[in-house]
Swiss-Prot record:
Transmembrane segments: none annotated. GO terms for biological process: carbohydrate metabolic process; pentose-phosphate shunt, oxidative branch. The keyword Cytoplasm applies. Keywords: Cytoplasm, Hydrolase. This is 6-phosphogluconolactonase 4. InterPro entries: 6-phosphogluconolactonase_DevB, Glc/Gal-6P_isomerase, NagB/RpiA_transferase-like, PGLS.
Length: 255
């Protein structure tokens, strides 16, 4: 059964989210200076949440062992890094760059694994190579994967609908080229559920009233046509959901 944490105050949600990540870091590193913390993150609003919970929280920030972090992206849009739609580009702008102003030099910061930008725009063969190369970089398993959930129930770039079965049903390959995203840009790469299933811990962060209907479908109805529900079914007790009261408005208090 998945774990559900709900918060009425944004400040409390963000702080507890940061504490959760910190706990997973400590579990992975166990005081070993040579150990690494393998974490994968989603794009979108996750970047701002990571800034608020890890960089801007003065109680959390001093305990983050950035040089031991190995950061990957659960999905990435096949656009240049300076494009506003680039997950890495937005992560750099929102999280990495502010680390300089916190006294951390970037060469002492986390190691971030990006797609091969030089292959972007090279067509089908190049797009498949981008996915294959990124898959080759991944660790055997992640200590933590941070996910979002779209209003349609998608997570990573795994979307509901039969036209996306080639992505959702893949359990052999770790990373695939998504060539028909319903949201621009249509070309992306995405983790498959095979990667998520092997993670030591998975966490969804969902905020806002726009998500209340899909949260009901995911957590109460448990519609197995939704990729986010498939994560719950596959990973079970390793999944934690962080919701604000707006997103959880249709979830019973005792759930």
């Amino acid at each position: 059964m998945v774990k559900l944490q709900r918060f009425s105050e944004k400040k409390s949600l963000i702080h507890e989210f940061g504490k959760f990540i910190l706990e997973k870091q400590e579990s992975a590193l166990t005081g070993d200076a040579d150990a690494v913390f393998n974490i994968a993150i989603s794009g979108g609003s996750m970047n701002q949440a990571l800034y608020e919970s890890l960089v801007n929280d003065k109680n959390i920030f001093p305990h983050i062992k950035w040089p031991q972090w190995r950061i990957f992206f659960c999905d990435e849009r096949l656009v240049p890094f300076e494009d506003p739609q680039s997950n890495y580009g937005q992560f750099k702008k929102t999280v990495l760059d502010p680390l300089v102003h916190q006294g951390n030099q970037l060469n002492l910061g986390p190691t971030v694994y990006t797609i091969n930008e030089s292959l972007i725009g090279g067509g089908e063969t190049a797009n498949r190579k981008i996915a294959e190369e990124y898959a080759s970089m991944l660790p055997a398993s992640f200590d933590l994967i941070l996910l979002g959930c779209g209003e349609d129930g998608h997570t990573c770039s795994l979307f509901p609908g039969v036209e996306f079965n080639y992505l959702v049903e893949e359990m052999d390959r770790k990373v695939l080229w998504c060539n028909n995203s319903p949201k621009a840009p249509k070309d992306r790469i995405t983790f498959t559920l095979a990667v998520v299933a092997e993670a030591k811990s998975v966490c969804f962060l969902v905020r806002g009233a726009a998500k209340k209907a899909i949260m009901h479908d995911v957590l109460i109805v448990k519609n197995s046509e939704l990729p986010s529900v498939l994560v719950n079914e596959m990973v079970g007790t390793k999944v934690t959901w962080f919701l604000d009261d707006e997103a959880g408005a249709l979830i019973p208090e005792n759930c």
